[in-house]
Amino acid sequence: MEVSLAKKWEIFQKGMRAMAFDFKKEYKEFYLPKNKPQIVTVPPANYIAVRGKGDPNEEGGAYKAAIGVLYAVAYTIKMSKMGDHRIEGYYDFVVPPLEGFWWQEGVEGIDYSNKSTFNWISVIRMPDYVTKAEFDWAVAEATRKKKLDCSSAEFLTIDEGECVQIMHLGAFDDEPATVALMDEYLKANSYENDFSKTRLHHEIYLTDARKAEKDKWKTVIRHPIKKSE
């Protein structure tokens, strides 16, 4: 039976996806933890980042604008293989999930009842071959091609070090119960949280919240830790 052109294209796309480096699959210990607390040491990694303040649920707000910038730059790097610009060491990759670092002034951890006071750094991880120079190229290219101001994007290398993490299943507003499990685990194992201006509440969003019911949302929650004195 003759295979249609559309079917051939579908097979080709599946093959291309199969060859793309997927951070979630290659680094399962960081992206797919169990639903019980575990301690991990997270190595330094490069990120595209945008900083901001305020309620992430605000329609037309800074958070949603930041996400648009992040994906514009990330996909410009991913799709550079289709243009004339060549990135040394390039390999194709699945754009990793959106992540966020969150804090509030004068609060240890997160006060979920007062979202308007959130400070955040929204990030997407990049392969190691993405240097500051390649990032700068991607920002300029995304701005030019997509007619979108991407100047708010930053290139960050983040070294999280020793952390506790867990897979949270459910709505974001239900996270306090999961965080309580993390805190209990730390206490039982002679650890404590180690929040600071550079070590923050970290979330990795594995579910597209627009396409799934809240009770199906999967979010990695990660906290910096240290041994109790």
Task: For each feature predicted by the language model, list its residue ranges.
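Short, Lys/Arg-enriched N-terminal segments with co-localized hydrophobic residues
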Residues: 3-18
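A solvent-exposed interaction/effector surface
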Residues: 18-229
